[in-house]
Structures are given as structure tokens and as C-alpha cells.
Design a protein with these regions (language model features):
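Short, well-structured N-terminal submotif of metal-dependent ribonuclease cores
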Residues: 1-40, 52-65
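Acidic, PIN/NYN-like endoribonuclease modules and their adjacent C-terminal/linker elements
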Residues: 2, 104-133
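Histidine- and aromatic-rich ligand-binding microenvironments
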Residues: 5-6, 18, 36-39, 95-97, ...
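Alpha-helix capping/helix-boundary segments
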Residues: 9-10, 41, 83, 103, ...
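Phosphate- and divalent-cation-binding pockets in alpha/beta enzyme and binding domains
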Residues: 22, 44, 86, 123-124
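Active-site-proximal, substrate-binding regions of enzyme catalytic domains
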Residues: 46-74, 86
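Active-site neighborhoods of divalent-metal-dependent phosphate/nucleic-acid chemistry enzymes
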Residues: 74-117
Length: 133
């Protein structure tokens, strides 16, 4: 089944000190499944890598290598963002950031499980009747 993956999970595939058994399992599953992300994902992914580089936890060369490895993955970026009213409703109902609400919205629309490590988003996915990967 296709998966919705958040940026922290995808970063953990390439940054070993951020990997967990969960992210490793999702990485193996992702090799066989189509991945889906909301429009915010490229910004979050790039920002996470930039923060790691900026703090000198990764070199610029390592970050560039990660980007080279991610680009060929079949990640469907859903460019249409939900209307602000929809994001606000989900954020209010589940005490989420608008960014996390975009992942929840995508999960509810596509009915695909969400792979994330974020506690509030995991709780919201369950509460909204969506599935976790």
C-alpha cells in the first residue's frame, strides 16, 4: 500500500544517528511502495538538511549526496495545498501545527497510512481515524 511519509522519517533514512527501528522498517517498505507527501515536504526536508549542515553535523558534500539519493525516489508531491480554513480546522481539532495538519489532510483524502515520528501527528492520525504505517 502506498505511504505518506514525513520529512523526519526520510531524513532518518540517510542520517544514521537519527535512524530508529521504525524508520528502518519504513525505509524497507518504501522500496516497494509509492510514497506521497504534501506540498510542504520539500521545504521541510531541505530545511532539516540545512539545519544539520549549519550545525556542522553533516558536511555540504554529505547533504548534496543525500539530495542526490532522494531525487530519484518515486515521491509524489501533492502540490495542491488544502485551503487555510481546512488546515486551521484540522490544526484546532487536533492541536497540530498547520504543517502537520497538511500531512493529516493528505492521509484523510488519500486514505494511505502515515509514516511519522512526531507524537502529536501520530496521535492526531489515530484520532481522525486514519492509519499509521
Amino acid at each position: 500500500m502506498p505511504l505518506i511519509v514525513d520529512a523526519s522519517v526520510t531524513v532518518a533514512w540517510f542520517v544514521r544517528n537519527q535512524a530508529t527501528g521504525y524508520t528502518d522498517r519504513i525505509r524497507r517498505q518504501a522500496r516497494k511502495e509509492r510514497l506521497h507527501v504534501p506540498a510542504i515536504w520539500p521545504l521541510e526536508f531541505a530545511n532539516a538538511l540545512w539545519q544539520l549542515e549549519r550545525r556542522r553535523l553533516l558536511s555540504g558534500r554529505q547533504v548534496d549526496t543525500i539530495v542526490d539519493l532522494v531525487e530519484p525516489l518515486e515521491i509524489a508531491v501533492h502540490g495542491e495545498s488544502p485551503p487555510p480554513r481546512r488546515l486551521l480546522a484540522l490544526a484546532r481539532d487536533h492541536d497540530l501545527s498547520a504543517y502537520d495538519a497538511s500531512y493529516l489532510d493528505l492521509a484523510l483524502r488519500l486514505r494511505y497510512p502515515v509514516a511519522c515520528r512526531d507524537g502529536p501527528l501520530r496521535k492526531a492520525v489515530r484520532a481522525a481515524g486514519a492509519k499509521l504505517a
